[in-house]
Each structure stands twice: as C-alpha cells, then as structure tokens.
Amino acid sequence: MIHYFIGDLGHFFVITSFVAALASAFSYFKGTNATSLEKKIFWTQNGSISFYTHAASVIGICISLFVIIANHYFEYHYAYSYSDSKLPDHYLVSTFWNGQEGSFLLWMFWQAVLGIVIINTNKFWEGPVMTVFALVQAFLASMILGVVLPGFDFRIGSSPFVLLREVMHDAPIFQSQPDFIPKEGNGLNPLLQNYWMVIHPPTLFLGFASTLVPFSFCIAGLWLKRYREWVRPALPWALFGGAVLGLGILMGGYWAYETLNFGGYWNWDPVENAVYVPWLILIAAIHTMITYKNSETALKASMILVVTVFILILYSTFLTRSGILGDSSVHSFTDLGLSGQLLIYLLFFLFGAIVLAVVRWKEIPTTDKEVSTYSREFWIFIGTLVLCLMGFQVIMATSIPVWNSIINLFGGSSNMAPPADQIGYYTKFQLWFAIVVALLSAVGQFFWWKKIEPRQIGKELLVPFLTSLVIFVILVNVLIFQFGSDSIKNAGYLLILFAGIFTVSANGKILFGLLKSSPGLSGGAIAHIGIGLMLIGIMFSSGYSKIVSLNNTGLLYSREASEEYNRDNLLLFINEPRSMAGYEIEYKGDRLEAREKAGFVNPNDIEFTDDPFMVVARKDIVYNKNKLFHANDTFEIFPENRYYEIQLTGTGGQKHTLFPRIQDNPTMGMAASPDIKRDISKDLYAHIVDLNDPEKAEWSKPEEIKVTANQEFFANDYVSALEKVERVFSIGPVKLDSSDVAVKAHIRVKGEYEEYIAEPIFVIRNRMVGRIPYEVRDLGIQLTLLNIHPETNQFSLGISSRQKDYVVVKAMEKPLINVLWLGTFLVMTGFGVAMVRRIREFNKMKEKGLE
C-alpha cells in the first residue's frame, strides 16, 4: 500500500514554507520602509508571524521526510535512492541529507533557527535583516518545491516527496503494476556510513547558514544608511560562522583521514576547495571588521568581504549541485535540473548587493588618516590581502569547468582540464601563502597589541625569534636523525617549520601578557598559536609521511601490477608473521561485525543463512573475553562490512590490533577504509590494497580418503585427526525429525600457528543423503563427510583446497599528526573566546539602548 498521506503532508509543508517566506520578506520590507510607528509595528509583527509559520513548516517537512525514511517507504524516490531497511538508525539520519533535497532542507532548517534567534535577540535590526533572511529562505524553499508551472514545461525545484513511479515512469514494472513498491532500497553510499557523516554535514550547513547573518546585517546597514552600526552586531556572528564553518571543514578532513584510503586529510577536491575559499575570505572579513571597530578604517573592505563570503557560499552550492563539475569531484551531486534555478539564486543576490553598494558607495564613510607601515591597520591589510590571494588562487583553478562553459556559451571553444595532480598543484602555491600568513600572524600581533615604534621592533621580537631558532635547530637535527640528510633539502618545508614555530613563540608571548591583564582578549593569540601548530603538524604529517609496508622480499607480487604496487605493499598470508617498521605484523583473518552487540565475529564460527544479514553461531562466540553469543544463537551481522584483523607486536611484546575495512555494496561496489594505530608522536595508518576473495577462488577436486576414529591424516599438508563422530538431532537452529539421521564428525586440524576443529555433517532425510561440508577458511581447506562404512568402522572424507587466505596491506607513518589536531582545537578555542567577548560587548550596548 502506498502511503500517500505523509508525502502529501510533506508537500503541503513545502508550499507553506515557500509562501510564508515570501510573505515574511514582503512584510518585513514594508515594516522597514514604513513611515509611521503604527505601520512599522503592524508589518513587523506580520513578518515575524510569517517567519514563525515558515520555520514551523520547515520542521514539518523535516519530520515528514524522516517518517518516510525511518519507516522504509520505498515507494518514495528519496527513501529508495538513499536508504535500505537494514541501515542502523544513526545512518538513517545521514540518509536525510544524502540527497540534494535533504541537504537543501538541512540548510533551510539552520537558517530558520538562526532567523528565530535574531527575531528574539535584536529588535532594532529585525526588519531589514529578516527581510534578507526570509528572501533567502524563499529561494531555498523553491529548490524543493517540485512544482510544474501551468502552461510551461518548466519545473521549479525537486521535491523529496515525489513517488518512485513518477521518476521511473518508463520502467516496465510500473506499466504493469502502477502501485509496485520495491522491497528494498538502494542503500546509503558505503563511504557515508561513518559516524562523522552523522555530524559533519549538519555542522557544515550550520556554517553555511551562519554566513547569511553578517551578510544580512551588511545589506541592512547599506539599506538604512547605517554604514557604521551594522559591524557591531554582525561581528559575533562572523566569528560564530568562522568557528562553525572551520569546524565543519576540519570534521570533513578527519572523516577523509579515517574513512578514505589516500593517506591524508585534504585532497583539494573541487568541493572541498569551494568551502575552503569562503572560510578564508570570512577570516579576512573578521580581521577587517575588528580593525574597523578599533580604528574606523577598512569599513568598505569589510563590506566587500562580508558580501563576498555569502556569494561564494552560493557559488559553491552552484558548483556542487549544478552538475558542472562532472567527474572532477567525488562530492558533487548529480544534476537534478536545478542549474538554471541555482544560477538565478546566485545572480540575484550578487547583482542585488552590487547595485546597492554602488548606489551607496560615495556615502560610506572613510578615513583620511594615513596608514603607517608600523600601524596595526597596515599589517591587518597585508594579512587580509594574502588570505584573499590564497582564496583567489584556489577558486580560479577550481572553476576551470565554469570558465569552459562560459567560453563555450559565447561561441568560443575551451576544453581546459583541471590540474591532473591536484594535491601537488595547489600545495605548491598554498605552501608559500601559508608561510607568509604564519609570519604575519606572528609579527602583526605585536603591532596590534604593543603599538610599537620602528626602533622597538627588534627588541620586541628578539626573544620569540631566538626561541624559535633554538627549537628550529633542534627539530632539524631530529629530522636528520629520523629521515636522513635528504629530509632537509626542501626549503619550503624548512621555512614552513620555522614560520609555524615562530607563530607559536610570538603569539605565546602575547598570550602570556594578555592572560595576566585581560584574559578575555586572548582569543586571537590562542587561534594564531593553533594556526602555527597546524602548520607544523601538516608539514610533518604530510611532508614526512613515510610508507613502511615495503616489499623487501625481492619478489614481484604480480607482473601485471604497477611498480608502486609491488614496491610499497606488504603481502600477508594468514597467520604468517612478517616484520614491518619495528613491529611483527600478522594477518589473523577476516572478521564480521555483529549488529546487536559491539564486537567482531570470526566467519569460521558461524553458519550463513539464506538471509545475508542473519547467521547462526556454530559455537560460543567470545570477543575480548566477553561472550557475545551462545552456540546455535541466531543473530544479525553487517554483511557489507568485512574487517581484516592485523595484529602488531612491538619489540617489548606489547600488542595492538588493527581492523581495516572493506565495504562491499552490491550497488556501489567496494570501498576500502583504513584503521589507525595512534601514538603521541605518530600515527600508523594501514588499509587493505588487495585481498584473496574466497567467493571467487575455486576449490580443487576433492581428494577422497578413508579413515577411522583417532586416525591421523594430511589435509592439504596439515596434520589432522578424526577425533569422533556423533549423532546430532539438530543442525543449527533446525530440529530434525525422528526419522532423520544426522552425524557430525569432529576433525582436529593443526595449522602452523593454531589448531582448528572442523565439523562436517552427513544427513539422511527422506531417504535422501545430504552432506554439509565444513570450510577452514584460514587454511583454505574444506572437509566433507562423504560416507560411513559401518562394516569396517571407517569414514570417507573429501578434502578440497584453494588459495590460502591473504591480504595486501599498505601502511604509512604520519609523524606528529597530533600536533595538527591540537592546533585545530586551539583555533576553535580562540574563536570561542573571541566570540564570547564580542557577544558580551554587544549585550552591553543593547542594555544602553544603542543596539
């Protein structure tokens, strides 16, 4: 039965949210321009009521879509495309924003929340700010309308409540069965089945939403000709946006580090770049806004940068969702036909902001004060310029597909390709920009706080410089000791190392002074120390990352494989230890993850059923000394996830186990995810490059032998013994009838490092003979009880073999990567301290009636 009601309800909420947003924008516009207090109050109240209606409708849309996903209503295209009935609940949440419609909805939700916060905290600016807010919400709501205009072959938006049959109307099944409902959905992308994907997108979209607030205040300031006053209420929100958007970017990097297998945390993917660039410009805007607050300079620059940030957010949305990136990004959505609508959205606010700024430009106050080279304003300007250049370099190359489209649109011909080596291309530029930013953040702080004269520069910087020099020399010697003399030949690496150390040292001195006098002012110094540590961590973990899984056997794994494959990977046969990076490394076998209880299960210990998610325990299953299941228990597993147990043993005998994962999704293919051994000084990062697929390996023709009880024999060169044969009255959870006969053999197989018990079964049922073989997966052998010879007390066994289980592993050491993570924590802490200070400052002005 098709559940029409919930889809119709959701669609009703979509239309209501769109209409209410338009009504709110109109009412707030009228209220802002009203000449009488009575009309202003009337229209503002109408705007507020309309926006609350809009927000309630957005929540209604969210609830409706969650109901469809959670109840597995696969008659709806959205639920069918991105979920299945076996997904854990927390990944069902990820399904919500996996598609374009859901991510637009998430963006709308956060902006609705922020709009309500502004309505309740800032009555002075409510009218003009909420006009912009509501207008943006109307554009976003239009993206999920899914309405075809009467008389036009044009659809506005793409609805998350469309039925599968409406999208796949040409499918034969819907021709014969219009009400057909699939029993299962396509499932969630394996790479998104990660806990970071539950929290990273909401954080990132909250960052997107927060950039609207300073943009709205800036537009409101231009609109009302309150050119100076908008900065104070906008600054805390800019800091909030910088913190949240930065946190979202960092979460994405950490997700990539833990989930993808390229060995890093930033791949310079076009969509990563399209978020990174607005964040850079937002940081630049924060600095110019702070400069204006303190010296009334850089007001125009602040306006330009704040507007640019929001426009870049819209541009990144266009890049991601229009399909223009094609295959150049792993993050981009498929084109839902919204490219024209997205372009209108972008151009409306771009040209609207430009026109308003041009009209008001001459009225915007400026200062005639000459900026000295030794003034803080000068150094802020230089830093802002460098940040903008960093963003410009990245966005120009990222936008190559856009430039091609524009040239082709005007009759030209262009097929420029994005950089083949993205990491190398962007890094060679961003490295030098980062060095300059680090040095400026060190030196600029002294000009900001100390207001030093030219003759005092050397004195103020001497201690931080000498401290940095000493630490730098020590670390260079550590590099030579650890990586050899070649490690210091890259001048860029050495410069970024010194710049990072100098940033920490110089800002540390500033921080020490501020903590004694004014702790509330320390946010900038803390954030800059974090930036310095991040640069040091990036330099070590990326520049001095080392592959440790080298093939030292002198043998090729495969003549068809690349030189890199044969050189940089380690072949591990099961239970055969090898040496690697000061460890004894041993592959212990593949494992499955139990669904109901936290733990891994050895496939040797379970029987698979017709349902790939359900298995039966052959014996008591124990993991980490905890009994998970009893023999013959039926329980659920995650069949898509296969983990490979890699045991590391240090020189002191200490053991650590890694579980790198392969996800095999029937629709989306295989995806490898690493596991990481974390130490204070470095990470050991390992993932599976290749493996022996037991499903594809062919069994040899069975060798038949006759044995008696307790007789030893060889099973594929492994000493084995038939210990006993006993009658059984059930096979797994299935009870046998009294007329059935089943016997189970107990065969002990001695592997090189471990003993195994094989239990093949011989069944006579309804005068039919059946045989259930037993596979010892670790050894690549299969034993079958072929026949019973009561006259001689012998048993016929069939022995088959195939390739012994193995994996090919790639492992890397990431030195001092924890310095990077510590730096990110300090950056976020610095943002938090600065934000609290600006909020308190704003509240004090509110209490005085000045806001």
Language-model regions: role of each:
Residues 1-851:
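Solvent-exposed, non-transmembrane regions of integral membrane proteins
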